From Swiss-Prot:
Gene Ontology CC annotations of this record: cytosol
EC number(s) on file: 2.4.2.8
Name of the protein this chain belongs to: Hypoxanthine-guanine phosphoribosyltransferase
Cofactor(s) the protein needs: Mg(2+)
Listed InterPro entries: HGPRT, Hxn_phspho_trans, PRibTrfase_dom, PRTase-like
Binding site for Mg(2+): E99, D100
Residues the record marks as active site: D103
Example of a GO biological process term: purine ribonucleoside salvage
GO molecular function, one term: magnesium ion binding
Annotated organism of origin: Streptococcus thermophilus (strain ATCC BAA-250 / LMG 18311)
Leading EC class: transferase
Family under the similarity heading: Belongs to the purine/pyrimidine phosphoribosyltransferase family.
Binding site for diphosphate: K43, G44, R165
Amino acid sequence: MLEKDIKKILFSQEDIVTKTKELGQQLTKDYAGKNPLLVCVLKGAVPFMAELIKHIDTHIEMDFMVVSSYGGGTVSSGEVKILKDVDTNIEGRDVIFIEDIIDTGRTLLYLRDMFKYRKASSVKIATLFDKPEGRVVDIEADYVCYDVPNEFIVGFGLDYDEKYRNLPYVGVLKEEIYNK
């Protein structure tokens, strides 16, 4: 039923799991013995985080944030709002933000700077998807599974108007769906 709204599939579930496993193995090496705090940016990063933690073979802790810069459309508003902050004291902690996609970069620049101000020992960014063409600020992820074209993609947590997050793959949404 949802497939009819997808122009083309970019990454299958198998593709995503394979890349996520590779990232988990890298994080295991990079953070062995360090107990990093993984901060999942809700809602979109939930499937990525759930898959990723299965492949990290060292102690971790998790926390969650709700951050908004879209408000329901397809274009970032430019204003970052913290709707739910972390519960964990991050002072002196190694923090890894787990994000579904980096587009403009505004949200993660804001979060990175905020956590540095809160005296995190280190702040890194792991994203399933990076859209470099959309960037409007100077920020890069430390860990990227895939670079994606400047198209509106959905699935595996990515949504349009809270829909399509449950697709097990990632595809390009047909323009007529969001240009109604």
